[in-house]
């Protein structure tokens, strides 16, 4: 989705260098961007998809006293607040839209963030994430919107759930929370950072169990993009074979390891993120939990607590999608 959204500003800049876009050109560019976004979301709107795959579930997790999984009925019932603001995701930047949804500060008050939490990460169906300081979320009318001008948000408009900032009523948020903070297809609200809970077969590895396994370190550029530096960084974690062995899971020679993350695009059964077992000897994939020379835990803003790192020798056009943040499950399947 975010690649699609980047196309529109670039096109606008290129046109503006000549003479400025006409209204017709703006409408055409917006239509193209919306069509691309709709195509990107098609995999998650199949009739046989469950609610989590289609974004009609909102999960609240992390450092909260009351984690929850809200179904669409609950989301709709709680979405009683309105924010009237212009949107960064439309060509008519002067049109004030009446968004209806759930104020994030009310959501936080309900689920009880830990006192030391400083930020909240919103995860989208397509893997995009937006991390916002908790002080701003409590101060401003930041909304998880489900309607715009009385109509349910379509996929092309960022629905079912769209993270919206009050640019009109709180002008200071225009610079503080520019368009990169607005998030389409929100499915998870991660308060602070979750504890490690990696499911492998019928076992769940917690932080202590993960730390007891052989740790591997290496320096490399990372493929999660958001908030990570473009230069090499040290990452520390456990190889896939060691993780699977610790859980007593065998590796059939002709099998594959499916790596599942939090986002729907990383859990879609139609397009599993998988690694052939035969590749594990050649490519030491790491599930990483720490980064940097100080071995700091990977926070949610960087895709933690666990993320899959692709070895430099195996990183390429085909391997790039296997950079998976928020890893929470490993599954081994025999090839059919």
Segments predicted by a language model, with ranges:
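C-terminal motif of bacterial Sec signal peptides marking the signal peptidase cleavage site
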Residues: 13-16
């Amino acid at each position: 989705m975010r690649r699609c959204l980047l196309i529109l500003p670039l096109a606008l800049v290129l046109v503006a260098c000549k003479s400025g876009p006409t209204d017709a050109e703006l409408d055409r560019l917006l239509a193209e961007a919306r069509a691309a976004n709709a195509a990107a979301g098609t995999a998650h709107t199949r009739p046989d998809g469950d609610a989590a795959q289609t974004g009609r579930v909102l999960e609240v997790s992390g450092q909260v006293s009351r984690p929850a999984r809200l179904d669409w009925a609950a989301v709709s019932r709680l979405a009683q607040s309105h924010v009237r603001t212009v949107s960064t995701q439309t060509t008519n930047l002067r049109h004030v839209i009446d968004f209806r949804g759930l104020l994030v500060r009310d959501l936080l008050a309900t689920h009880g963030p830990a006192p030391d939490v400083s930020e909240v990460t919103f995860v989208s169906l397509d893997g995009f994430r937006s991390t916002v300081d908790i002080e701003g979320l409590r101060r401003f009318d930041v909304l998880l919107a489900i309607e715009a001008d009385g109509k349910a948000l379509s996929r092309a408009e960022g629905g079912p759930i769209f993270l919206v900032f009050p640019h009109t009523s709180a002008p200071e948020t225009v610079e503080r929370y520019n368009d990169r903070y607005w998030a389409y297809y929100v499915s998870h609200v991660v308060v602070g950072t979750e504890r490690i809970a990696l499911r492998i077969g019928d076992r769940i590895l917690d932080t202590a169990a993960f730390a007891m396994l052989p740790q591997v370190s290496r320096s490399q550029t990372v493929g999660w993009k958001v908030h990570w530096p473009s230069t090499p960084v040290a990452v520390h974690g456990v190889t896939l074979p060691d993780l699977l062995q610790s859980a007593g899971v065998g590796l059939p020679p002709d099998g594959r390891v499916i790596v599942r993350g939090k986002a729907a695009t990383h859990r879609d059964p139609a397009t599993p993120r998988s690694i052939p077992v035969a590749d594990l000897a050649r490519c030491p994939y790491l599930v990483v939990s720490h980064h940097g020379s100080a071995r700091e835990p990977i926070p949610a803003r960087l895709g933690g607590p666990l993320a899959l790192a692709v070895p430099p020798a195996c990183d390429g056009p085909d391997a790039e999608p296997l950079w998976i943040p928020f890893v929470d499950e490993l599954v081994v399947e025999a090839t059919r």
